[in-house]
Amino acid sequence: RTVVMPGQYFYFDMRQSPHEDGHDWAAIFDVRKTYSFDFARCGFTPAQEANVLGVEGAFFSELYVSHNPETPDYLDYMTFPRACALAELGWSEGVREWTEFYRRLRLHYDRMGAQGIHFRLMPPRVSYKDGVLTAAVDDDSQLTFPVDGAQPQPYTGPIRTERPELYLFRSSYRSGRSPEVGAPAYYRTLKP
């Protein structure tokens, strides 16, 4: 009998998007992919799955040491909420449904914030069409944007511009934050 830790789902030092810090040799994945873990998709037979006692996650310290180890921000950002999805997988049985899990996960934001955990929020959705830039979030986070490196300001609605590359959006809620993203054609993120 064994405990499993497939890297493409549970190595929390892996990048969460192509433009964020972290390793990428096992996979690039966020909380949604962690939650989507399935034994059959990973090549386990039913007989092999029957011998699994549980799942576990890992964060390899060489990456942490390269990011100011005096503060937990980077470790928190890389680990949470992926660790929440891992816990759900390890302790809950039955059919998993992302929308329901994400609804419950958002309830944990206040708890993680109260504990001082610097968790990662899902990135804002940004689009640019016909000279109009829009951004949205799926939670109660505050959406902000700096224009070309200026002080961030609250996003209150669509922005008319011919220069979408000057706008990057980030959401924050308590001690959580999202990566900073732009319109897909100009997409990039900053380091956490």
State where each predicted segment sits:
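Short, compositionally stereotyped local motifs that mark structural "simplifiers"
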Residues: 103-192
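Flexible, acidic glycine-rich loops studded with aromatic residues
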Residues: 1-132, 138
